[in-house]
């Protein structure tokens, strides 16, 4: 059904101040695909997916993300390098310029919503300069029924104009690109960047303020799935730690792969209606769900084709390492109807520790869970340039600091209370290195990580012996089905045990240094979850 024909007459952007625009409203995925190809802005890949290039920006630009400092946000947002304040007057002037820029142009408008739980539904209208940006929002946000559109009232608006360039000297931005949230006007304003993830993370950031402040609901940067008995599992983790991979389990139904809410009514729900997956080095063997989802309707970003073909070379990172695909969650077979589950029974914190110190699986106390949640640790492998092989620690509070407007301890307190009330087991999973740090040891085998998670989910680790790690104090199981017991204690996998002890203390000191800025806000239980540093 061509909704454009049905509803174009009733959609006006005058309320937004965009005048005389040619509005292409609620186009189907096929129509947006065709327009993008016809305009020369994209190419159809051999699988039927649409491939586009996002331009100069192939990732988010955290230094150019702002929140308008107003009566709603002034006393609640944790202002600083993550949440950078923007003056209401400056926003008004910049928004007026964007409105004038989009007036008298063809624009693509989509009505959608976020939050799959009907009690928390938030209607979002998206106004984009390009058809492919609109396709991204069709894929990623939830899609209302045609019957809902006649009476659709947007609560938030996303305005995305990639070819509008700000003037930093006049507009108060850092450079020509920007992503700004205004909680009074309820607008996410994006310009100067074609990276589609700015739209997704803009609304995620808005929900990360709205839900805890007004709805007593914990927003989470996590994936989630449900077992045959209705038991929900949640996987927190930064990019590259295995959220998408480990939540894709043939024995369990996927709720979602990235953004969820945990309500006071004991439900866990997906914010989104799609998946936004990395495709670097993608193979059907390692990631069958993602690989098979790259078909008609999917949107590939910044990939390269094999010479002379329209077949994607997933190993080619000549444009960026952050090659991506978005697709509706319905492209995956094994999904949870309605994208809602009940209270989780197990929570997994995923870290790719390339120092090789943390155990592959350990059980956390409530205090340790809060400490590690606030820390949000993983480690990046340094680039090979100039012979640098030493891993770099990466701490991102709540496993998603760039998207969290409130102080991290606010989210941690909510999580701690919910974990205690629901009697949740919390596990720290190291998907990183074993037998030494990066360069000496090896990456933990995926089959072992999967076996450990399966054992935890099935209750097979409830009655085994545990020994506390001497530095981090976390409880290491001494046995696990289908996993060699020698890898469960990381110290035993190192040839040089003294070096392991030294490096473990060094990592603990990195944790302590990072946590210093949170100490004054943390209670005694959380502080007791810290590692020993001497």
Swiss-Prot record:
Manner of cofactor binding, per the entry note: Binds 1 Mn(2+) ion per subunit.
One Pfam family, short name: PEPCK_ATP
Enzyme class of the recorded protein, top EC level: lyase
Gene Ontology biological-process entries: gluconeogenesis
Catalyzed reactions per annotation: oxaloacetate + ATP = phosphoenolpyruvate + ADP + CO2
Residues at which substrate binds: 60, 195, 201, 324
Top-level taxonomic group: Bacteria
Positions with a binding annotation for ATP: 201, 221, 237-245, 287, 324, 449
Main location: cytoplasm
Alphabetical list of InterPro entries matching this protein: PEP_carboxykinase_ATP (IPR001272), PEP_carboxykinase_C (IPR013035), PEP_carboxykinase_N (IPR008210)
Residues annotated as binding Mn(2+): 201, 221, 258
Cofactor(s) listed: Mn(2+)
Family stated for the protein in its record: Belongs to the phosphoenolpyruvate carboxykinase (ATP) family.
Function: Involved in the gluconeogenesis. Catalyzes the conversion of oxaloacetate (OAA) to phosphoenolpyruvate (PEP) through direct phosphoryl transfer between the nucleoside triphosphate and OAA.
Name of the protein: Phosphoenolpyruvate carboxykinase (ATP)
Species the sequence originates in: Flavobacterium johnsoniae (strain ATCC 17061 / DSM 2064 / JCM 8514 / BCRC 14874 / CCUG 350202 / NBRC 14942 / NCIMB 11054 / UW101)
């Amino acid at each position: 059904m061509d909704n454009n024909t049905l509803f174009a007459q009733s959609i006006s952007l005058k309320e937004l101040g965009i005048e005389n625009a040619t509005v292409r409203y609620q186009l189907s995925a096929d129509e947006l695909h065709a327009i993008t190809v016809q305009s020369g802005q994209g190419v159809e890949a051999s699988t039927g997916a649409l491939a586009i290039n996002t331009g100069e920006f192939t990732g988010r630009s955290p230094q150019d993300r702002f929140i308008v400092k107003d009566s709603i946000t002034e006393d609640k947002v944790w202002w600083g390098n993550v949440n950078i304040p923007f003056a209401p007057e400056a926003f008004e002037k910049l928004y007026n310029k964007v409105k004038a820029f989009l007036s008298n142009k063809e624009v693509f408008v989509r009505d959608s919503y976020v939050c799959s739980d009907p009690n928390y539904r938030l209607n979002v209208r998206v106004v984009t300069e390009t058809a492919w940006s609109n396709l991204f929002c069709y894929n990623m946000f939830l899609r209302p029924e045609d019957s809902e559109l006649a009476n659709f009232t947007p609560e938030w608006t996303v305005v995305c104009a990639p070819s509008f360039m700000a003037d930093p000297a006049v507009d108060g931005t850092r450079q020509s690109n920007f992503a700004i949230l205004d909680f009074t006007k309820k607008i996410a304003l994006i310009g100067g960047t074609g990276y589609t993830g700015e739209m997704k993370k803009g609304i995620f950031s808005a929900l990360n303020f709205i839900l805890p402040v007004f709805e007593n609901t914990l927003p989470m940067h996590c994936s989630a799935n449900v077992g045959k008995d209705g038991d929900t599992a949640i996987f927190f983790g930064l990019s590259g730690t295995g959220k998408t991979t480990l939540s894709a389990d043939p024995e369990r139904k996927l709720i979602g792969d990235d953004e969820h809410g945990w309500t006071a009514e004991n439900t866990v729900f997906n914010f989104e209606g799609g998946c936004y997956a990395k495709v670097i080095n993608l193979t059907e063997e390692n990631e069958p769900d993602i690989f098979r989802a790259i078909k008609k309707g999917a949107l590939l970003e910044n990939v390269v084709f094999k010479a002379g073909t329209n077949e994607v070379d997933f190993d080619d990172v000549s444009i960026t390492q952050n090659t991506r695909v978005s697709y509706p969650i319905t492209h995956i077979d094994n999904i949870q109807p309605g994208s809602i589950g009940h209270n989780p029974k197990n929570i997994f914190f995923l870290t790719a520790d390339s120092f090789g110190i943390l155990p592959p699986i350990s059980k956390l106390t409530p205090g340790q869970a809060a400490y590690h949640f606030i820390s949000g640790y993983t480690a990046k492998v340094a680039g090979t340039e100039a012979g640098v092989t030493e891993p770099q620690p990466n701490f991102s509070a709540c496993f998603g600091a760039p998207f969290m407007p409130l102080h991290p301890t606010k989210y941690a307190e909510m999580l701690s209370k919910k974990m205690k009330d629901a009697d949740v087991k919390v596990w720290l999973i190291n998907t990183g290195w074993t037998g030494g740090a990066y360069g000496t040891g090896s990456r933990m085998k995926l089959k072992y990580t999967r076996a450990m998670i399966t054992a935890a989910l099935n209750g097979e680790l409830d009655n085994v012996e545990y020994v506390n790690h001497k530095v981090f104090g976390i409880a290491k199981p001494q046995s696990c089905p289908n996993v060699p017991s020698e890898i469960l204690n990381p110290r035993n996998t190192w040839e040089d045990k003294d070096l392991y002890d030294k490096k473990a203390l060094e990592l603990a000191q990195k944790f302590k240094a990072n946590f210093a800025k949170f100490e004054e806000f943390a209670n005694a239980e959380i502080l007791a979850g810290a590692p020993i540093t001497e």
